[in-house]
Amino acid sequence: MRKAKPKKRQILSDAVFGSQRVTKFVNHLMYDGKKSMAFNIFYSALEKVRAKLSDEQKSSLEIWEHALNNITPLVEVKSRRVGGATFQVPTEIYPERKETISMKNMIFFARKRDGKSMADKLSAEIVDAFNSQGGAYKKKEDMRKMAEANRAFAYFRF
């Protein structure tokens, strides 16, 4: 176990939207330190989202943030061993972890999609998440259902 809690690193905001949340998402999207390529993928995905949802009054960044909020889980289950039996104990997720889980799920399910480029796949996943559909939304609902099913073990708090 580590001696002290690690310090939080300061994340710089991105150049186009001035948002730290965008930079955090791009950091999760990035492979092999190629951040400029990850930013290009993200911005082109947002342009494609804007084209797909042209009738929406929101900007592409607002659509992306709404999609992230739609797939953000509220509770998760953690394994807890009590007297030889392992229970799945539902616990609330703290805000920073909620955001990280939703970003990673969106990227994971975008990568699993069939499509030409990552920008196409990411834009399709953003549109699906905005409409409360897709793999990332299903994952959130599965987490919620698992926590609901194991609600009886909620008194085994951590």
Curated annotation (Swiss-Prot):
It comes from the Bacteria. The keyword DNA repair does not apply. Keywords: Ribonucleoprotein, Ribosomal protein, RNA-binding, rRNA-binding, tRNA-binding. SUPFAM superfamilies: Ribosomal protein S7. GO terms for cellular component: small ribosomal subunit. Disulfide bonds: none annotated. Belongs to the universal ribosomal protein uS7 family. PANTHER family: RIBOSOMAL PROTEIN S7. Part of the 30S ribosomal subunit. Contacts proteins S9 and S11. This is Small ribosomal subunit protein uS7. The lineage of its organism: Bacteria, Pseudomonadati, Bacteroidota, Bacteroidia, Bacteroidales.
